[in-house]
């Protein structure tokens, strides 16, 4: 038998406080209003008989005498094949104007996957983007963010990755999206041909902040079931985790929590980590690969959100000036696949290209300061132009093997074979044969 409580003592923003007993954290609550409407909330915290609830859809029209019913179960989302091709809001309701979605209700808050059942990542995820495939390989079950400067088109990069990987299912979690962003995701998924294997959970900028916090949990709960029960390789794309953190910040301020760095709650690190740790490669099962977007306010990489994220994830892609910056990017799992799942020259060639590109930046700096350039400086600057145009541009869309061949051609056009610092046996095998020492 469910107990009905009618003593709401405080309404503040999207949070209400009710006097009740026996509540548990994360428990789902139904609120029946005097006008006949009903809404849902979840338990955020409790102190003796005072229980704080976050109300989905806002508290507009709520009165202190409305009925509050604790349902004895956590927030749930529908799981099943019927999700594919559908779009949902932060409470799990369809927003694509189609029929109601039917499936198995599953809780959205579950522990991270059992470490005993995890396996060491060993499969490369190909994106056909040279700055990822060649220099910072994406590995199946990796958790990695895209650190995006202001004004960068990170959404287009996400959709390219979604379309060009071999993932069985793509789940997109959008937080704080404008209508333009939301429409872009819908149209691009259709244009690129993966809409039928895509599930979207969308929180728009005009929606309640409490719904924003639920988006990653819903996306990852469904991904975990697809990976575990159907052995699917699932790609989860979350954008924007800074909007997620801002929603946490707003809720913490409303609850009068003592703020930490720049007003964010002291639990920010844990709140991020518990989501990122859902990435997994399951023994005799599927996998979850997680790519997120973290925008950096004021291009500040020391901002609490990217700063905490960097300690949790396995590297990052640094998007700047419409390129993936090789010096700010890192994949901590690339050594598991480079040379093992890829061509033997991959590691040496990538290292040589990045080393020479770093030297070319120094030459460009000397040129800008008016210093006289040596012949070596001129070679480096010519190399830099070729490298940026043929490999760094995000317009380039080629498989890894072709990117490696282009890398050799760029070296051949810019240097003598003795100048690039690559092992002689690789030079003999891969250096263009027209002139071995040119």
From Swiss-Prot:
Single GO MF annotation: ATP binding
Keyword line: ATP synthesis, Hydrogen ion transport, Ion transport, Transport
Record-linked Gene3D superfamilies: 3.40.50.12240
GO process annotations (BP): proton motive force-driven plasma membrane ATP synthesis
InterPro entries found in the cross-reference section: ATP-synt_VA_C, ATPase_F1/V1/A1_a/bsu_N, ATPase_F1/V1/A1_a/bsu_nucl-bd, P-loop_NTPase, V-ATPase_su_B/beta
Presence of the UniProt keyword Magnesium in the record: no
CDD domains with a match to the protein in the record: ATP-synt_V_A-type_beta_N, V_A-ATPase_B
Free-text function comment from the UniProt entry: Produces ATP from ADP in the presence of a proton gradient across the membrane. The V-type beta chain is a regulatory subunit.
Family the UniProt entry places it in: Belongs to the ATPase alpha/beta chains family.
Listed name of the protein: V-type ATP synthase beta chain
Organism for this UniProt entry: Chlamydia trachomatis serovar A (strain ATCC VR-571B / DSM 19440 / HAR-13)
UniProt gene name: atpB
